[in-house]
Design a protein with these regions (language model features):
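Conserved Radical SAM active-site core
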Residues: 1-4, 17, 35-117
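N-terminal pre-triad scaffold of radical SAM enzymes
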Residues: 2-29
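Residues at the C-termini of beta-strands that transition into short coil/loop
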Residues: 7, 131, 155
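Structured loop/turn residues at beta-strand edges in well-structured enzyme cores
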Residues: 28, 63, 119-122
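Structural recognition of alpha->loop->beta junctions
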Residues: 53-56, 113-136
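Conserved C-terminal portion of the radical SAM core fold
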Residues: 61-70, 97, 128-134, 158-172
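P-loop/Walker A phosphate-binding loop and immediately adjacent motor/lid segment at beta-alpha junctions
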Residues: 78-90, 99, 137-172
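A generic structural signal for alpha->beta connector loops
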Residues: 95, 123-124, 148
Length: 172
């Protein structure tokens, strides 16, 4: 698996100050995608164990971070490898809230409870789901590009067996 970007601090990919990792590879090929170069699974750098530990040290060493966001590309095309990274993150840095982006919908990702995608979903807290649809582009939306995309509270959704929208801690 390759990563095509890492930002130790970002306010664009989820609520609060977050680290962001961009996973290479996507097969959705959404017209108007903001980063089509990330579709290539070989783009960027290998996500070696040494690089993973370096990023985990960054995250653990920054008390201002509210969590980690994983996007791409689409991380669910490398679900097993991304799950392994999240496991290592939690082992070495403790509980870190994880947001994840996907062109798949929550319903698609949660359909098969024995899949690698379902396992990855269960390791995360918030899912930004759905393909980017250029005709539904809305720059006023928080954390997503088109109005069909949703912010899903994964833990609540898995518990209730249906997609439950995420609620901001800053606007409750």
């Amino acid at each position: 698996m390759n990563i095509c970007g890492y930002s130790p601090e970002s306010i664009n990919e989820g609520e609060g100050l977050r680290a962001a990792i961009f996973i290479s590879g996507c097969k959705h090929y959404c017209p108007g995608c903001f980063s089509p170069k990330t579709w290539n699974f070989e783009y960027g750098e290998p996500f070696t164990l040494a690089r993973q530990r370096e990023i985990i040290r960054d995250i653990a060493g920054n008390p201002l971070l509210d969590g980690l966001t994983i996007l791409g590309g689409d991380p669910f095309f490398s679900a097993r490898e991304v799950s392994g990274f999240i496991d290592l993150l939690h082992l070495e840095a403790g509980p870190v809230p994880v947001w994840i982006y996907s062109g798949y919908t929550y319903e698609e990702l949660s359909a098969a409870s024995d899949s690698d995608e379902y396992a990855l979903l269960g390791r995360c807290d918030v899912l930004v789901d759905g393909r980017y649809v250029e005709a539904l582009r809305d720059p006023s939306l928080l954390y997503r590009g088109s109005s069909n995309q949703r912010l899903i509270d994964i833990k609540q959704s898995l518990e209730h067996g249906e997609a439950i929208l995420w609620q901001s801690v800053f606007t409750k």
